Swiss-Prot record:
Biological or metabolic pathway of the protein: Carbohydrate degradation; L-fucose degradation; L-lactaldehyde and glycerone phosphate from L-fucose: step 2/3
Entry cofactors: a divalent metal cation
Family listed: Belongs to the FGGY kinase family.
One example of a Gene Ontology biological process annotation: rhamnose catabolic process
MF term (GO), any: glycerol kinase activity
Keyword Metal-binding tagged: no
GO cellular component terms, A-Z: cytosol
HAMAP family in alphabetical order: Fuculokinase (MF_00986)
Protein name: L-fuculokinase
Group of enzyme by EC: transferase
Source species, domain of life: Bacteria
Length: 472
């Protein structure tokens, strides 16, 4: 008997993947190929995406899975991508201008001068989204100022997930989780903001019908089915921005903060209410729409493992195993014997170490970095609790930084709450598949789909004794 699966097409900045997931959230088959942006013809410093190349990469992945998928029934397809990017298209869905990449610097000047139209504070209060130069709003203003005729000619703007969905189904739609990253919404109304659109001279007609996560978009058309090597007629279900599905796929409940720990740490929560008027007071803050109606995802981000990479390169070598650094830091007591580190190496003039003596070792420096980053997390968690109106009783940790057991224990001790570590790296795919199963009618809600998954967490409890982490 063939196995039912949801096929998740995930377009990341560095990889394009096709992953088949069963009803219990287990991965049945997967394929991946490298993804990369292209240099724009107009300017060698500019970056853009080739939609045709991305679709061909999906096709390569799906075709490499043909043997595994021949044993499966693909019940539905969902598409997840990074946020903000998209393109203007004509009535046939043909791109009028290439997809400007989030890596492209051309929109930075628009962000710096957005006050010509609307104050940055009002913009964040309405949209929730922080001032990041890659925001969709700045792309559209750039296009309006540099290619005004294209906006007049355009049938609509499609976010990158919707560009892919259009190629699959022929339908023009807007994934709500993608719109939530755009800086164009009134986040409390869950719709495009008349005030932002009017201030910037953008027409509401540019944005096609909004679809909620888990809603059917259409079915796989013949040409797309032939390209992917799949049967035509498979339902395509709305997903969208990877972050929202990673939160849901990690098992996060409402009011449970999630820390994605990597080069940057991104702290978010699924909250029933949010005070967006507070956001502009905190650099690096943002708020996106949750995958489920009625919830918000306020969050903050800061450089984290990027600081630790710098410390390793400075005091060891870039190739030194992390365990060497961890072992040296573990030998130093909590508080690093008075050595402290201000870890904001990007913006703070006082960044660096204090309290250094002739007895200070590099283990002190690394331990102080771990404790300094944890202090930064503690401040940001308190801020997020205020913005999102919740009280954290535990912290769910995902990402590469969660493999550092010493750092996990320091977090538990300094925050004085349990740290819950999920080792499964495929949270985005898991979350999107749950909405896919709901969308094809297999479950009555995404939560019921999630309840089929057996999550395995490791806990780090607050300790007053020195770190006891052997065997973890």
């Amino acid at each position: 008997m063939k196995q039912d699966v949801i096929l998740v097409l995930d377009c990341g900045a560095t990889n394009v993947r096709a992953i088949a997931v069963d009803r219990q959230g287990k991965i049945v088959a997967r394929a991946s190929t490298a993804n990369a942006s292209d240099i724009a013809a107009e300017n060698s410093a500019w970056h853009q995406w080739s939609l045709d190349a991305i679709l061909q990469r999906f096709a390569d992945c799906c075709r490499s899975l043909s043997s595994a998928l021949s044993e499966c029934v693909v019940r539905g397809i969902t598409v997840t991508t990074f946020g903000v990017d998209g393109a203007l298209v004509d009535a046939q869905g043909k791109l009028l201008y290439p997809v400007i990449s989030w890596k492209c610097p051309r929109t930075a000047a628009v962000m710096e001068t957005i006050e010509r139209f609307i104050s940055p504070r009002q913009l964040q209060t309405l949209s929730g989204v922080g001032a990041f130069s890659f925001n969709t709003l700045y792309k559209l203003v750039w296009l309006k100022e540099n290619h005004p005729r294209l906006l007049e000619q355009a049938h609509c703007w499609l976010f990158i997930s919707s560009l892919i969905n259009h190629r699959l189904t022929g339908e023009f739609t807007t994934d709500i989780t993608m719109a939530g990253t755009s800086q164009l919404l009134d986040i409390h109304q869950r719709d495009f903001s008349p005030e932002i659109l009017q201030a910037t001279g953008l027409a509401r007609r540019l944005f096609p019908r909004i679809v909620e996560a888990g809603a059917p978009i259409g079915t796989l058309q013949t040409d797309a089915a032939r390209l992917l090597g799949l049967p035509a007629g498979v339902p395509v279900i709305s997903a969208g921005h990877d972050t929202q599905f990673a939160l849901f796929g990690a098992g996060a409940q409402q009011g449970e903060p999630v820390l994605s720990s990597g080069t940057w740490e991104i702290l978010m929560v699924r909250s029933g209410q949010v005070d967006t008027s507070l956001l502009s007071q905190y650099p690096g803050s943002t708020c996106e729409l949750d995958s489920q109606s009625g919830l918000y995802n306020p969050g903050m981000q800061w450089l984290a493992s990027g600081v630790l990479e710098w410390v390793r390169k400075l005091l060891w070598t870039p190739e030194t195993p992390w365990q060497t650094l961890i072992d040296e830091a573990r030998a130093i007591p909590a508080g690093a014997e008075g050595v402290r580190m201000q870890c904001d190496l990007l913006a703070c003039q006082n960044a660096g170490w204090q309290g250094v003596t002739l007895n200070t070792t590099r283990g002190h420096f690394y331990r102080a970095a771990l404790e300094g980053l944890t202090a930064q997390l503690q401040r940001n968690l308190r801020t997020l609790e205020k913005i999102g109106h919740f009280n954290a009783t535990e912290l769910l940790l995902v990402g590469g930084g969660s493999r550092n057991a010493l750092w996990n224990q320091i977090k538990a001790n300094q925050l004085d709450i349990p740290i819950k570590v999920l080792d499964d790296a495929e949270t985005t795919v898991a979350g999107a598949a749950m909405f896919g199963w709901y969308g094809v009618g297999e479950f009555s809600s995404p939560e019921q789909a999630r309840a089929q998954v057996n999550y395995q967490y490791r806990y780090f409890w607050p300790q007053t004794e020195p770190e006891i982490i052997e065997g973890v």
